[in-house]
């Protein structure tokens, strides 16, 4: 019984984000496809998208060698976790690993020394 209830709650929990999406009536919205005009100049958004598509194969091939993040241009909006860590270090003034170890140290219980050295586990001599 508990397993069934927990499965239902888990299923509803996964469906919750789907229920929050707006639903559109298909009769209200008509499908509009626009053909690209070859004579029209490209906008900056289209140029940026084209440059990202050109960089993508290079990044995928470079990921095997591990040098893809070095080749990526800083003007592209590609997530770089090491760059974000450097920004965090500049902002906070300390290494994120040190901060994490301090946070975890507060959670741990302090080690208590035994009062009597004659006792081992729960057996005392």
Curated annotation (Swiss-Prot):
GO CC annotations, alphabetized: extracellular space
Q: Which UniProt keywords apply?
A: Cleavage on pair of basic residues, Disulfide bond, Hormone, Secreted, Signal
Q: Which GO terms describe its biological process?
A: blood vessel diameter maintenance; regulation of blood pressure
Any one GO MF term held by the record is: hormone activity
Does the keyword field hold Cell cycle?
Answer: no
Q: Where in the cell is it found?
A: Secreted
What is a single Pfam family found in this protein's UniProt entry?
Urotensin_II
Q: Which residues form the propeptide?
A: 21-111
Listed InterPro entries: Urotensin_II (IPR001483)
Q: Give the highest taxon in the source lineage.
A: Eukaryota
Q: Which cysteines are joined by disulfide bonds?
A: 119-124
Q: Which residues form the signal peptide?
A: 1-20
Q: Which family does it belong to?
A: Belongs to the urotensin-2 family.
- Described function: Highly potent vasoconstrictor.
Q: What is this protein called?
A: Urotensin-2
Upper classification of the source organism reads: Eukaryota, Metazoa, Chordata, Craniata, Vertebrata
Query: Coding gene?
Result: UTS2
């Amino acid at each position: 019984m508990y397993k069934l209830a927990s499965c239902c709650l888990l299923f509803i929990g996964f469906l919750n984000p789907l229920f929050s999406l707006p639903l559109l009536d298909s009769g209200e919205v008509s499908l509009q496809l626009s053909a690209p005009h070859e004579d029209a100049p490209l906008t900056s958004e289209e140029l940026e998208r084209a440059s990202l598509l050109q960089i993508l194969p290079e990044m995928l091939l470079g990921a095997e060698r591990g040098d893809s993040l070095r080749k990526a241009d800083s003007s592209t909006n590609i997530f770089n976790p090491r760059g974000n860590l450097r920004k965090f270090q500049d902002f906070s003034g300390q290494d994120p690993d040190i901060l994490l170890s301090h946070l975890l140290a507060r959670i741990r219980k302090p080690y208590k020394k035994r009062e009597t050295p004659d006792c081992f586990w729960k057996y005392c001599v």
